[in-house]
Amino acid sequence: MELKFMDHVGTASPEEIARFTAMAEAWWDPQGKFKPLHRFNPVRLAFMRRHFAAHFGRDESLMRPFEGLTLLDVGSGGGLLSEPLARMGFAVTGIDAGDKNVAVARLHAEQTGVPVDYRVSTPEQLDPNEAFDVVLSMEVVEHVPDVSAFLGHATARLKPGGVFMGATLNRTAKAWALAVVGAEYVLGWLPKGTHDWNKFVRPSEFAAMLRDRGITVRQMAGMAFNPLSDTWRETDNLDVNYMLFGVKG
């Protein structure tokens, strides 16, 4: 759940902005309210690095394999993905509708010396001539009122031949049991009410909306939690958390 991007223009959800703004100070606390993000971030980043390297013909073993490429992190929150991706060489622009989230992200980037262009913005507010090699939307679509409109604005920022990377929760009974009941009410990983199961998006729905915007999904992968080791891993099972990689054109 990079749970944060809801704007005040066309893809608006003031309630969601308020919810995640209230937790903004906790973004970089690995034991705090965003602990799940810190836990599965390595899995997400490994998936991205592997597929970005293959698509752009870069050497994955290099420290900064993506020098010269631009990336837009839509709903960047406190910068938990923006910063490590910038360390990989991307010129990263992180946008979020919550000004407090952006303030936290900027401060942390200054403290760590990682160059990220953070903006209080939504995709439709960006310069229409501004385009990116990669557009990222991780754990965001389940928090917007109109997924189709949101994806339309986000993918419009993608260059031809560019990559869209997304992640969300599947609308299954298993996802309701684990991501809502388990994570919010039993384990207390997230504040109650963080997720609305009705807003979860099936992989087929996500892929179809992207296809309508000229993006072909090339790869999907799930993420599974092991309670014994307190770790996440990539899996072929898409029943709960899943990621997808698509190419425009």
UniProtKB/Swiss-Prot annotation:
Give the EC number(s) under which this enzyme is classified: 2.1.1.222, 2.1.1.64
Q: Which CDD domains match?
A: AdoMet_MTases (cd02440)
Q: Which residues form the signal peptide?
A: none
What is this protein for, i.e. what is its function? O-methyltransferase that catalyzes the 2 O-methylation steps in the ubiquinone biosynthetic pathway.
User: Keywords of this protein's UniProt record, alphabetized?
Assistant: Methyltransferase, S-adenosyl-L-methionine, Transferase, Ubiquinone biosynthesis
Family as reported in the entry's similarity comment: Belongs to the methyltransferase superfamily. UbiG/COQ3 family.
Which reaction is recorded as catalysed by this protein?
a 3-demethylubiquinol + S-adenosyl-L-methionine = a ubiquinol + S-adenosyl-L-homocysteine + H(+); a 3-(all-trans-polyprenyl)benzene-1,2-diol + S-adenosyl-L-methionine = a 2-methoxy-6-(all-trans-polyprenyl)phenol + S-adenosyl-L-homocysteine + H(+)
One of the record's GO molecular function terms: polyprenyldihydroxybenzoate methyltransferase activity
Binding locations of S-adenosyl-L-methionine: 44, 75, 96, 138
Please state what the protein is called.
Ubiquinone biosynthesis O-methyltransferase
Q: In which pathway does it act?
A: Cofactor biosynthesis; ubiquinone biosynthesis
One Gene Ontology biological process? methylation
Q: Which SUPFAM superfamilies match?
A: S-adenosyl-L-methionine-dependent methyltransferases (SSF53335)
Which InterPro entries would you find in this protein's record?
Answer: SAM-dependent_MTases_sf, UbiG_MeTrfase
* A Pfam family: Methyltransf_23
Q: Does the keyword Disulfide bond apply?
A: no
